[in-house]
Amino acid sequence: MGKRIVIALGGNALGKNLPEQMLAVKETSKAIADLVEAGHTVVVAHGNGPQVGMIQNAFAAYRKQEPSADVIPLSMCVAMSQGYIGYDLQNALKEELLNRGLQQGVATVLTQVVVDGKDPAFQHPTKPIGAFMSKEEAEKMAREKGWHIAEDAGRGWRQVVASPKPLAVVELTTIRALAEADNVVIACGGGGIPVIATDHHHLKGAAAVIDKDLASELLAEHLDADMLIILTAVEKVAVNFNKPNQKWLDTLTPEEARTYIGEGQFAPGSMLPKVEAAVKFAESKPGRTALITLLEKARDGIDGKTGTRVTC
């Protein structure tokens, strides 16, 4: 019997520019179609770290030429990234399904996610976005543009922005209805458009980028998914990563995860939120499983052949 699965796809897996994205979504679609073909109901969430930074930089460059142009809020940049990533991914996935003789629909839902305007994350930016830079380039941007910057898991330096905790998925009912009607749904792009609920049902955009793994966990929990698959750049979670005593983990319990987190084993903004999201989902209801693995290993991971499985 097929499972209801939420996939959290990393923004870096979608390429650094539009041509790369066009190629990346084709490979991504093959892996997603494998799961659909196996009889699973699939909802796809994705990151947007590189993409939202590119959009923000493009508008900043335009304002240099047109100083009177409006400043585009970060929440609107997230919305734009949902649109253009969803467009490419939706078309590539539909094409792949049709090539396999599968008739499921594919729908992208512009998704808002509620955050707390008083979340301390707004005072302590941690979420990397945009292009990787050298330390010198990053320090220059910090001086000239007032950016908050940080090293990103040894891969270079990036701008960091606020990443508040996701509280509710506004379009949850729509996403559920589409999934139950045998559609592959693309939702919570970039962690969702961050909004703050004000009086009289008004939603106000927030200057933030929500972590897509935590947003995907929230979505999976409230869709009553059987499995959350968090895709990353490695086949399994490791402790002592990139050290001589590195150890790959086939399984991980919440208790073990908390011990490793306390030891600082997982990089903030990289593997840490993935493990935290996996633990939260596994603990949310008996029988739920989270899987952390490579995109191309997702189907094998479901079958228990690879990846790191997080269960209670």
State where each predicted segment sits.
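C-terminal catalytic "cap/lid" subdomain
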Residues: 2-312
